[in-house]
Amino acid sequence: MLSYRKLAMCVLGRPLHTGGGIDSPRPASQRAAALVLTAAMLTTLAAPAFADIWHIENGDITISAGESGNNVTQNNNTTYGDTNTIITNQNKDTASSHTVTIEAKDKDDKVEVTLKDVNIDASSRSEAAVSVTGSGNTTIKLDGDNALKSDIYSSGISSSGSLTISGGENDSLTAQGGSGADGIYSSGSLTISGGTVTANGGSSGGGDGGDGIWSSGGVTISGGSTVTANGGDGKDDYG
């Protein structure tokens, strides 16, 4: 661990030597400069990538693209610069009715969020369990088993822009659309890269059922993914 003294000596060198074997301190201006530079260097050395775990039971979560990471808001409190946003349930066996909104407003915006053993049932909320808005690029990384269920006419995941869902061989996602809604809906492009993804369209509810997966920008499946799409009440598996 570097000390202020060692860093200051690196910046200015050792004290001045005068006759008689007595060291003369550096001028005050140089000592002040050393302290400023040392503090700046220590701040840089001690600044790790910031990450936080967000429990969905504590309230709705909104994630937006920021200059140095994600800006995450929950219960009207915003954390800036989160570079590894992880959303989870405190008890994955009990579904939460709170929802996740991801905002990648501009086409150059990039947002990455990890869902870790998330269990959301928003069937009482009149909205999607996970909504992705804007024209930017969003990546949802899967960690563990994740389940999303939405209300009538709301998809399990509803997305605009470019959406990528990624995971490993032991990671999974089940997205259940509400009545008349798709399991996964994207008005942009959709890429599924790795993991096991099951998308179920909702039942008709007196009208048309929902597709398992519907994307106006096309669907790309890669990375050893296992994808199952089930349309509801005679609807297409893929729309």
Where are these regions (language model features)?
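A composition-driven surface/loop motif
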Residues: 2, 7-11, 31-239
